[in-house]
Amino acid sequence: MSELLSVALFLASVLIYAWKAGRNTWWFAATLTVLGLFVILNITLYASDYFTGDGINDAVLYTLTNSLTGAGVGKYILPGIGIALALVAVFGALGWVLRRRRHHPHHVGYSLLALLLALGSVDASPAFRQITELVKSQMRDGDPDFAVYYKEPAKTIPNPKLNLVYIYGESLERTYFDNDAFPNLTPELGALKNEGLDFSHTMQLPGTDYTIAGMVASQCGIPLFAPFEGNASASVSSFFPQNICLGDILKNSGYQNYFVQGANLRFAGKDVFLKSHGFDNLYGAEELKTVVADPSYRNDWGFYDDTVLDEAWKKFEALSRSGQRFSLFTLTVDTHHPDGFISRTCNRKRYDYDGKPNQSFSAVSCSQENIAEFINKIKASPWFKDTVIVVSSDHLAMNNTAWKYLNKQDRNNLFFILRGDKPQQETLAVKRNTMDNGATVLDILGGDNFIGLGRNSLSGQSLSEVFLNVKEKVLAMKPDIIRLWNFPKEIKDFTVDRDKNMIAFSGSHFRLPLLLRVSDKRVEPLPESEYSAPLRFQLADFAPRDNFVWIDRCYKMAQLWAPALALSTDWCVSQGQLGGQQTVQHVDKAQWQGKTAFKDTMIDMERYKGNVDTLKIVDNDIRYKADSFIFNVAGAPEEVKQFSGISRPESWGRWSNAQLGDEVKIEYKAPLPKKFDLVITAKAFGDNAERPIPVRVGNEEQTLVLGHDVSTITLHFNNPTDANTLVIAPPAPVSTNEGNILGHSPRKLGIGMVEIKVVNVEG
């Protein structure tokens, strides 16, 4: 209703101003600004819905103040460009319409009415309401009801008798199981769901809407609210250290806790969370690659679901035989947005909707088949009678190729339980949310019927039942939940551990690199993750007077304040204000002691603008002074004009990447010497090893032969044509996820370059 009202007010404002207000520059500018704000808000709402499927939520608020980088972003570039072009077109059209009758005399009354209607359209828009509520949640001190409803459970189960298998289905919401809406999409897992306790109304709340957040909610009974973006949790050393979560209780009760997934455990700090709360046995992409039958059988995120669930079955079988009380948690990945992945063992690899194949539905149909096969193995085993199986979605599906069809339905998270000790078949329509999952499981295992804000759905009352406005209520509790992190409020002395890549201050530890915004009563950590911008881009968003401490590789800050360290990959510490003074210190000891020293100096806006502009220079445009191309730092020597076909810097150097160009091309500003030696330190990847690799300068071509290990080879060139471009053409680029950022499409690697040096031997 508010959406229709806001649109009606917007159109009324446009029509009244265009036809009645007449000409006046001030009123035109004011009205266009407010109407333009309405357009921006609604485009933001549309764009947010595209990424999250949940409008402008907590994750979007973070993204609006940081650049979106990381997993799968390439697939969103085109929609982003489209939105930007649409915004320009709409503003142009709006300005043209408002000035249609600019030659008419100005009328104050109609101008005022048009402006008031424009303001009303903004106030009535859903986007404005969502942003207002989010901003309020950042400014509140907390909610008095938090202390009433937050309950800490007993640390042990008195007499545990049942083992636990808990399966998180990536984005595998209950909506997919509506056979009327999506016929025969989930026959195997749907049949199992109908055999157990099926909770049909599990809603999604703020702070529970992505994987690590859904895991925290289901095990600790709280949303994942933190003083940083949730997927950046990998940088912290402990995770809600004061909370008692399901894993803690299980461990205290004699359980061995296992977690198995196909993706890297470091992503979003799942390893930190699980280790902080009772899990001693973790298996992710790195741990599984030495034990799976085919280590090369992977998708963009890690190992396929059939591989992961096979390993989970082996763990279940071995643990059951041992007689040890255990819990086994596993997380699938094949249904990850935007498209999903199809494992090779599925019987049904294709699902058509609206008369055409749909990749996301196909991935769901395949993944649920794999999950059902895993469950049926457990059910057929002699150990099922001592086992409770839980199947839940980690969160609702984000914007995938099935999303518009899902949104036509009443959407809920999946949560059902199969009890081997006491089979029970029932569909329960009680209103609940994912924070209730852990408490429900804990009670079945013999423990308390509450964890945090979660309640057992069989015997307690969920917050979703208590509060009609439960989403707003949870946002109001955000400051209370953030306080559970027990983060320090000041930093004076700190220690950088060079070997462990950690910084410690005021009793807290963080992984490096790290950026800190420091104020009188708050220290805000800004870690770097797959989903966040590089720290220098985050620093560029600081105000001129914001105090900062930035710990990163020296070369990243050298271009600003320490040119002598431009090629250093050691750790450096910079602190100061972007509009004032900055210092850079080289971390030259294993245990390096530092102190904060923020000087109250005059703010220089020219200095501030220059610093911000330099911080925002993209990696490939950075230039440094050196007599060779050093590939493990960003940028290139000053003599290089541009380069292509080269991937990002890694600790050892850079790979060629045929996804970015069929050949490696390095174009110099001036012609290369008439006669020179080309000294290349590099290695080959895959089938490129021990094969001739063409290297060209102008019309002359030499061949380079590399092995899998790094070696240095010198090639001799004559350059009579004064060519200025070096071309290296790996013969057999290999599509691989080797060293890839989680969730990115595979790279096509050829050679790994450490250093290239041009040595003039002319004359």
From Swiss-Prot:
Top EC group: transferase
Segments crossing the lipid bilayer: 1-21, 26-46, 77-97, 108-128
A Pfam family hit: Sulfatase
The protein's annotated pathway: Glycan metabolism; osmoregulated periplasmic glucan (OPG) biosynthesis
Family, as annotated: Belongs to the OpgB family.
Organism: Salmonella choleraesuis (strain SC-B67)
Annotated protein name in UniProt: Phosphoglycerol transferase I
Keyword Transcription among UniProt keywords: no
Protein's job: Transfers a phosphoglycerol residue from phosphatidylglycerol to the membrane-bound nascent glucan backbones.
Annotated CDD domains: LTA_synthase (cd16015)
Molecular function as annotated in GO: phosphatidylglycerol-membrane-oligosaccharide glycerophosphotransferase activity
Catalytic reaction(s) noted: a phosphatidylglycerol + a membrane-derived-oligosaccharide D-glucose = a 1,2-diacyl-sn-glycerol + a membrane-derived-oligosaccharide 6-(glycerophospho)-D-glucose
EC number(s) from the headed UniProt entry: 2.7.8.20
